[in-house]
Amino acid sequence: MASTIKKVKKPSWVDVKAKLANFDNAGLIQLVADLYAAEKVNQAFLHARFSIGGDPLEMYKKRIQKALFPNVMGRNSDVKITDAKKAISEYQKAIGLTEGMLELHLCFCEVAMDFSTDYGYEGEGFFNAVYLQFKKAVEALGKVSVEIQEDALDRLYDLRNIASNVGYGVEDDMGDLLAEANPDDERNCD
């Protein structure tokens, strides 16, 4: 006799949405309050989404700083690229403004390069992550105001120059991206 094993369906957003449809306004507010109390990441998401408590980027920048420039003398002295990328991803889900995304990509690169030059930290995976964030910053340039572009370009060229000290072809790769995105800039010849 063959036994039949019934597969249990994994819950999805559709299931949650169906349950939420039965909530009244007070019930939804209480649910959000419970989520808010449950996790700091939920608090950060809601603060960012509703622009509560000052600069929503500041908390995400602090997380990037903590992940990419750890206290090398402390207990948690490992560089955590995944945590830094997660901070950017969470900002994107909460707000996702192009200007903010650009700022966080630049922050990631600047903090990582500072750590690398201060402590001689290196590794192909580390620099690949820096390059990918640098590339995302370059790609965002065309989607922001000229004023923001100019500031971002200054910072990107500074990063390219700092990369000349780290090897792994990082400076060349960054330079190629900048020359392609901004071909008439005299800094491409540096």
What are these regions (language model features)?
Residues 65-147:
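Charged linear interaction tracts used for macromolecular binding and regulation
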Residues 7-74:
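N-terminal interaction modules that seed assembly of large macromolecular complexes
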Residues 23, 38, 70, 74, ...:
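Surface-exposed polar/charged interaction patches
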Residues 5-11, 80-83:
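Short linear motifs at secondary-structure transitions and domain/linker junctions
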Residues 34, 38, 46-50, 64, ...:
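Residue-level signal for alpha-helical context at structural boundaries
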